């Protein structure tokens, strides 16, 4: 039995891991799917002050209060920043990290560096528009279809802007985790392809692929679960 902590990306919530969590639980694992502050069922906590450090603390606190000591920490998309920041504090309590189409930060980087021009424009205009959270993308653009796309579109909520503009401090916590798996989907993104090239062949890193869209936990929960179980 392995403890898995599954961290969602921007606009989503812990709910998006439902299919994968059900499969991992059925296989005998213990699964935590926290929702980051200001999103999902915690969207009522959204303020202009919710930033990257808020979300990092969300995950550090799950590890601490659930008393996890040998966990697999999984981050999707934006959560690459959250997982990397959390690893600075709790790397010793992790047996492995999996990044699913996730952004891998460098020293002093921010999500605004990795996002689309449209979102950068919205962030730049925020002081005038007064918005504190970013609208998301349609689920169909993330590889979801049919009733799954309807479900994702219904439950996604605006994402706190400050989490995109806060710059991260990383000093090698993630690299100290013994096993690291980068899972790349078929979603077109040059910066994610660059990350694959960067980690391929590096000590402790493995790379795997899934032939599905960006929201792999919805689009291909069976395939994603199989890959995550290799870390158990």
Feature locations, PLM:
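Active-site nucleophile elbow and catalytic-triad environment of alpha/beta-hydrolase enzymes
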Residues: 154-173, 186-188
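Residue in the alpha/beta-hydrolase core beta-strand immediately N-terminal to the catalytic nucleophile
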Residues: 35, 72, 95-98
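Conserved loop-alpha-helix segment in the C-terminal half of the alpha/beta-hydrolase fold
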Residues: 185-218, 230-231
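Flexible "cap/lid" loop of the alpha/beta hydrolase fold
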Residues: 88-135, 163-164, 168-169, 191-192, ...
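Short, proline-enriched alpha-helix->beta-strand connector loops that line the catalytic pocket
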Residues: 175-180, 202-205
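Gly/Ala-rich beta-loop-alpha elbow adjacent to hydrolase catalytic centers
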Residues: 74-75, 79, 83
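Conserved HGGG/HGGXW glycine-rich cap/lid loop of the alpha/beta-hydrolase fold
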Residues: 2-43
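Active-site loop/oxyanion-hole signature of alpha/beta-hydrolase fold enzymes
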Residues: 32, 38-71, 88-89, 114-116
């Amino acid at each position: 039995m392995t403890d898995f902590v599954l961290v969602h990306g921007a606009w989503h919530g812990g709910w998006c891991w439902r299919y994968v969590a059900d499969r991992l639980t059925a296989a005998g694992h213990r699964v935590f799917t926290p929702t980051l502050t200001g999103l999902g069922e915690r969207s009522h906590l959204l303020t202009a002050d919710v930033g990257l450090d808020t979300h990092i603390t969300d995950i550090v606190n799950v590890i601490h209060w659930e008393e996890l000591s040998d966990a697999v920490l999984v981050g999707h998309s934006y959560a690459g920043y959250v997982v990397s920041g959390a690893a600075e504090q709790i790397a010793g309590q992790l047996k492995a990290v999996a990044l699913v189409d996730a952004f891998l930060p460098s020293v002093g980087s921010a999500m605004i560096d990795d996002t689309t021009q449209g979102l950068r424009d919205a962030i730049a205009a925020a002081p005038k528009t007064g918005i504190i959270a970013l609208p998301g993308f349609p689920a169909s653009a993330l590889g979801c279809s049919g009733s799954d796309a309807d479900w994702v579109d219904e439950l996604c909520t605006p994402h706190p802007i400050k989490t995109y503009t806060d710059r991260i401090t990383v000093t090698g916590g993630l690299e100290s985790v013994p096993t690291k798996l980068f899972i790349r989907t078929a979603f077109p993104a040059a910066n994610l392809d660059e990350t694959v090239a960067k980690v391929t062949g590096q000590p402790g890193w493995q790379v795997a692929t899934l032939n599905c869209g960006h929201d792999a936990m919805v689009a291909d929960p069976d395939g994603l679960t199989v890959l995550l179980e290799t870390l158990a």
